């Protein structure tokens, strides 16, 4: 993987990630394909929304179908028939979200399989091995996602363990002679001094890119913005920056304003299945009775298959009848909406009018532009 920083405006960055499997224009949003599928979509449909890179889930694909089935096909690209690059998370967050059914030790994490209750152990080395078998173009280190809230001491202990696991991940990745990219993950909760320690340790180990982890786990938005403003300027300028598990459309804009290049989130797909659809002016809840007789498209500005062919009335009808097509059409629209936002951000950066884009983005939602700490 090669990263090229093409242009900057303030902290916002316009760049390119070059992989053997294709080029990804940044800032980029990655749809989430947890089990080797973006729910309800064929790979061609996902590509049709403008997505150039997908996220796969190491933890879930390890439990089902498992490494052996993956190797029978070649790798995850062959298994799911996605021709572009794939980033896989390390499984750290999924293990973290198992709650009381897991036990974290210095070696790794002991837990019971959510599939069949079997006792399972995962560590940095195992995560690297699974991601190697998946053929991931971007491999994430195995880390511990610091919960929120956490005391300074709890966040410190968690962050220090993540650093040791990062080193083990790096060593195993190098031992495999894996030709792909390995990203480090900055932890430290909402504490700036801990983020400093994490950044320093990770940059010393050396990675192909750096993720900011442990955000969007329940902390106030102001804390997320503060940590990004503090952390991003310390990360190497010539490496991509990835904000994990984020987020709402405004979170993408705010992340880019603070120097982030890559995002992923289940929100566009999950919300689509629940009938919450993103449009230029905000959100439409297609379930609401007022859409029953509305023959207009979801968003007159949207060029997606759904908006070009169907009315709100039809989508309301499909939702009320729990038709699979409704979830599919909604997902196509939401994924395209997210890709349109990213394309608009990239164009605005190319044309040196990103600040104007931000003002217009919030004006259409009748909201104030959130404050940004001076450079």
UniProtKB/Swiss-Prot annotation:
Residue ranges of coiled coil: none
PANTHER family in alphabetical order: QUEUINE TRNA-RIBOSYLTRANSFERASE
Family per similarity comment: Belongs to the queuine tRNA-ribosyltransferase family.
Family matches, as Gene3D superfamilies: Queuine tRNA-ribosyltransferase-like
Pathway assignment: tRNA modification; tRNA-queuosine biosynthesis
Residue numbers spanned by region RNA binding: 245-251, 269-273
Any Pfam family: TGT
Residue numbers binding substrate: 89-93, 143, 187, 214
One Gene Ontology term from the biological process aspect of the record: tRNA wobble guanine modification
Binding site for Zn(2+): 302, 304, 307, 333
EC numbers for this chain: 2.4.2.29
Co-factor requirement: Zn(2+)
Protein name (Swiss-Prot/TrEMBL): Queuine tRNA-ribosyltransferase
SUPFAM superfamilies in the cross-refs: tRNA-guanine transglycosylase
Disulfide bond sites: none
Keywords noted in UniProt: Glycosyltransferase, Metal-binding, Queuosine biosynthesis, Transferase, tRNA processing, Zinc
Cellular component GO terms held in the UniProt record: cytosol
Function text: Catalyzes the base-exchange of a guanine (G) residue with the queuine precursor 7-aminomethyl-7-deazaguanine (PreQ1) at position 34 (anticodon wobble position) in tRNAs with GU(N) anticodons (tRNA-Asp, -Asn, -His and -Tyr). Catalysis occurs through a double-displacement mechanism. The nucleophile active site attacks the C1' of nucleotide 34 to detach the guanine base from the RNA, forming a covalent enzyme-RNA intermediate. The proton acceptor active site deprotonates the incoming PreQ1, allowing a nucleophilic attack on the C1' of the ribose to form the product.
Keyword Mitochondrion: no
Reactions performed catalytically: 7-aminomethyl-7-carbaguanine + guanosine(34) in tRNA = 7-aminomethyl-7-carbaguanosine(34) in tRNA + guanine
Top EC group: transferase
Subunit structure: Homodimer. Within each dimer, one monomer is responsible for RNA recognition and catalysis, while the other monomer binds to the replacement base PreQ1.
GO molecular function: metal ion binding; tRNA-guanosine(34) queuine transglycosylase activity
């Amino acid at each position: 993987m090669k990263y090229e920083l093409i242009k900057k405006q303030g902290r916002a960055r316009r760049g390119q990630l070059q992989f053997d499997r294709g080029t990804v224009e940044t800032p980029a949003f990655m749809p989430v394909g947890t089990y080797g599928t973006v729910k309800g979509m064929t790979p061609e449909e996902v590509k049709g929304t403008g997505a150039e890179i997908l996220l796969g889930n190491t933890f879930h694909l390890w439990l089902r179908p498992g490494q052996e089935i993956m190797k029978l096909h070649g790798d995850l690209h062959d298994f799911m028939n996605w021709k572009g690059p794939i980033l896989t998370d390390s499984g750290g967050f999924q293990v973290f979200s198992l709650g009381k059914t897991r036990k974290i030790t210095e070696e790794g994490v002991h837990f019971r399989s959510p599939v069949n209750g079997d006792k399972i152990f995962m560590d940095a080395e195992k995560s690297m091995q699974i991601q190697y078998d998946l053929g991931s173009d971007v491999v994430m280190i195995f880390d511990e996602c610091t919960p929120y809230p956490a005391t300074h001491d709890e966040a410190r202990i968690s962050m220090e363990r993540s650093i040791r696991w990062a080193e083990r991940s790096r060593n195993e990745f190098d031992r495999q002679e894996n030709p792909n990219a390995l990203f480090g993950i900055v932890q430290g909760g909402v504490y700036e001094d801990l983020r400093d320690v994490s950044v320093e340790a990770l940059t010393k180990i050396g990675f192909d890119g750096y993720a900011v982890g442990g955000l969007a786990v329940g902390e106030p938005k102001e804390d997320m913005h503060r940590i990004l403003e503090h952390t991003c300027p310390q990360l190497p300028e010539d490496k991509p920056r990835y904000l994990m598990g984020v987020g709402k459309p405004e979170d993408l804009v705010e992340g880019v304003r603070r120097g982030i290049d890559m995002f992923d989130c289940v929100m566009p797909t999950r919300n689509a299945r629940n009938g919450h659809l993103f449009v230029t002016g905000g959100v439409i809840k297609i379930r609401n009775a007022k859409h029953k007789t509305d023959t207009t498209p979801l968003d007159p500005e949207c060029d997606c298959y759904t908006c070009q062919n169907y009315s709100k009335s039809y989508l309301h009808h499909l939702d009320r009848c729990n038709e699979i097509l409704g979830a599919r059409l909604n997902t196509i629209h939401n994924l395209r909406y997210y890709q349109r936002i990213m394309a608009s951000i990239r164009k605005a950066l190319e044309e040196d009018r990103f600040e104007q884009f931000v003002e217009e983005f919030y004006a259409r939602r009748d909201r104030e532009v959130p404050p940004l700490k001076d450079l």
